């Protein structure tokens, strides 16, 4: 596994119930491959891997990366 993939991760903390965290695949076709639903206060640490190229957050959450911190908004 490429070392870069194993070190890139994000911390996502739900600010409201029902936050969806969706993993998307690498390759010629980007596809959904994993989903988690978080309730208020729950935290997930998501990692970019050889299979995961993007992470989508739907709902209000605090997102922390090596590049900084941001907050997603309600739809």
Curated annotation (Swiss-Prot):
Q: Which Pfam families does the annotation name?
A: TrpBP (PF02081)
Give an example GO biological process: positive regulation of termination of DNA-templated transcription
InterPro entries listed in its UniProt record: MtrB (IPR000824), Trp_RNA-bd_attenuator-like_dom (IPR016031), Trp_RNA-bd_attenuator_dom (IPR023558)
Q: Which Gene3D superfamilies match?
A: TRAP-like (2.60.40.50)
Tagged with keyword Transcription: yes
Q: Which UniProt keywords are listed? A: RNA-binding, Transcription, Transcription regulation
Source domain of life is Bacteria
Question: What are this entry's molecular-function GO terms?
Answer: RNA binding
Describe, as the record does, how this protein assembles with itself and its partners. Answer: Oligomer of 11 identical subunits arranged in doughnut-like structure.
Which purpose does this protein serve, as stated in its record? Required for transcription attenuation control in the trp operon. This trans-acting factor binds to trinucleotide repeats (GAG or UAG) located in the trp leader transcript causing transcription termination. Binds the leader RNA only in presence of L-tryptophan.
Known HAMAP family for this protein? Trp_attenuator
Similarity remark: Belongs to the MtrB family.
Q: What is the name of the protein in this document?
A: Transcription attenuation protein MtrB
């Amino acid at each position: 596994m490429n070392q870069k993939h194993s070190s890139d991760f994000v911390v996502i903390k739900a600010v409201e119930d029902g936050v969806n965290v969706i993993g998307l695949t690498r390759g010629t076709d980007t596809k959904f491959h994993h989903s988690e639903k978080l309730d208020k206060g729950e935290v997930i640490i998501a990692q970019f891997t050889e299979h995961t190229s993007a992470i989508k957050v739907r709902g209000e959450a605090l997102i922390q990366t090596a590049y900084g911190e941001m907050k997603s908004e309600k739809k």
